[in-house]
């Protein structure tokens, strides 16, 4: 398998183990071996704290991975993370569970040696989760087997089934494994998983009948009640409320917020189908689970002889159906004990206490044997189907050990004794294999092996397991001997047999001071991890694990197929006393040690940061306790007994070669020689390092840290140089690219311009020749020779005309057209003028239109006829010269509803004497009204207005002629207005007398009264003068403004 040289971090930066050394003050070191004060437990824990604070939950002790449970999802187990760690050297990436998984897998593939990953730690430290993550990694990253992914799916789906039947909520962990598990995963020669096998150890079956306050029974009971279908529960005789079952209420913790039993049951049901459970097998399995609940609800009452009698007939009825046994047989087995004496079978009745004991013993036996059957069933499902093929021999095995860690509680009993004995054996194996691995590496590298002083816990293992004199042997002997054996007699036997052992102590053997901390029913062992005090109460009973013979006989007759396999009839004919629980556990543990010894080990030590299961909380007391019991300091001390750091020459030279001028930038010789030159330049002292065959060994972390600090400084310098070189290169390349592009563009553009210029010259020459020929023949009829010229002349005229069109209707300019376009030019001129007029007319407002119409009428009447007309042209006509407020209300009242269209102040001349008088001239729709102050002096209807006379001079007099026959009128009216042109134009329009305005040259005759006429004489002079002449005429002298 090929290595990938590097890996990318989440930010895209290459991350290696050494790259984090520069941040060691903030996040700690990634390998405890690099701790300067490696013997200090405080320094060890402080390094853990720093990393935990930064969400770095993994740290190495050499090849051993220490994991701290974060109690929250850190999003570090995604497919992206798996790819990041797959195929990468162990020290090329930060510490991670996947790094260990990949290293183990690559060793399995390349070295063809069986591997084992040992996961240990106390409950709630994350062992089960680590096992699941390892299986997930192998399922996602390993190649798929040729026959599909069935085995891979079964490996993954075996977990939820085993968790349902073997895990429970405890005070320390909501999903605590209550059994030890060792799983072998078989891989073919291609590295694909093809099979598996599971071994289970020491299921905590006492939990079936008893739970401490705040704890639960095994998950499967609650999952079935919460998630089972109504029909299934009815068939099993169950109801959903867990409070209805004695075995589920003792912990008083049926509901847990962090556990969803309903959804978990769906996962379990799906998993059962994946691992080849038939519907009948599922039904039989659920019947057994339900029978345990019903068994817990069996109650007894004492008869007159104090013998126990079953009082819950309904529960007994369900039990007989679910377990497939006879009701009377089961009743008798629960209330009597069968004794065989001298070949005779005797039934001894049980009292209430003994009956309850028998009931609970049956419940524990049924559940524990069902669990063992379940493991065997899963193993059959995981077994490789190619075991008989020749390629089977090429398979390799990877073992996963999820075992309970060292346990020290307030009250420690038989279970803790077995668990801690197991940890002693594993610690013994761990130290042995670690020292062996260290020694083999030293020898392979040609480095002298320095003997390591360490605590050999063989003395404790012998104390527990030695034949005849060990605790287990003494316990078995006490269980087997005739007579009244009790837990206290067992303790006395221990005191007599091993009283001189330095690691054993009881109340009787202790000094006065120590006795205060030991009860008379306790003994204390000094384990490798510290002292543990055990209570002997229940040791004999739990070791015997006694199930009365008639209960076995009853279960052997079961028609439930699973029960029939769990209780084999051969047990009844076997007269040999069954092995005790402790002996069985010792034998299985010795077998496990041999299995692990045959494999290449890897270690994962799990630590729980606090008891409250809260993220971000670091309980130093609790962690110090676990560091001690996991033997991590001892592990570190063994690892650091020689050299703290070792790396291949190639990797060391590649990382640090920039620190030496001779090795930078390229070393062409052997890597070993390059490293020798490098360390001499760095000033390493002989006692600080050793040169092996393929690796350099550095004794002290401070030597490595000094080198790393120098590298960080050197990197800054190199980074500056690289940046400068890169910028120079980058801008040079950019300049050259721009230059090449510019030359290319210039070349192309010059060619284009040249071609355009040549084409233009050719076109110009042809055009000039055609124009000259056309000009010569311009007067000839149209022909091919002059057509281009004529068209050019016409086009030029039209284009020039477009630029020289008249600006307005008064502009009469127009370009001179060529002879051929004269007619067209006139038509265009007419169209242009019409268009300008039309546009102008569309643009004027109604008010302006009225103004123009009045001006047009004034022009028609006065233009060229009256001297002062030109002065009135630029002056706008006003709609009225008097406002409403200037006209008397009495006048307005006299006019009634008639609107005033125009009003102007005038001067009226009397008919006799020509005396001037101020008046107002009002025009209505039907009459001319002359007003004096508040009185209407004269009203002239338009029908009686026969004409209007005015002189041709610049004066402002005019005469309104009325019909002589009108009796209402006294005669014509002589008036003077400063706005004579405006007044006469509006009067003529209102009275429809445009054609009745007379412009006289010398005099005007008007009717002065009945039978009398008056005359107004007009003469020109230097200034305006109006007087009565001696001849009785009205003489008007007016200056001449325009010569006509």
UniProtKB/Swiss-Prot annotation:
The modification Phosphoserine is found at residues 389, 517, 845, 1022. The keyword Transmembrane does not apply. SUPFAM superfamilies: P-loop containing nucleoside triphosphate hydrolases. Residues 28-712 form the Myosin motor domain. Residues 715-744, 738-767 form the IQ domain. It is found in: Cytoplasm; Nucleus; Cytoplasm, Cell cortex; Cell projection, Stereocilium membrane. ATP binds at residues 69, 77, 120-129, 173-177. Pfam families: IQ (PF00612), Myosin_head (PF00063), Myosin_TH1 (PF06017). Myosins are actin-based motor molecules with ATPase activity. Unconventional myosins serve in intracellular movements. Their highly divergent tails are presumed to bind to membranous compartments, which would be moved relative to actin filaments. Involved in glucose transporter recycling in response to insulin by regulating movement of intracellular GLUT4-containing vesicles to the plasma membrane. Component of the hair cell's (the sensory cells of the inner ear) adaptation-motor complex. This is Unconventional myosin-Ic.
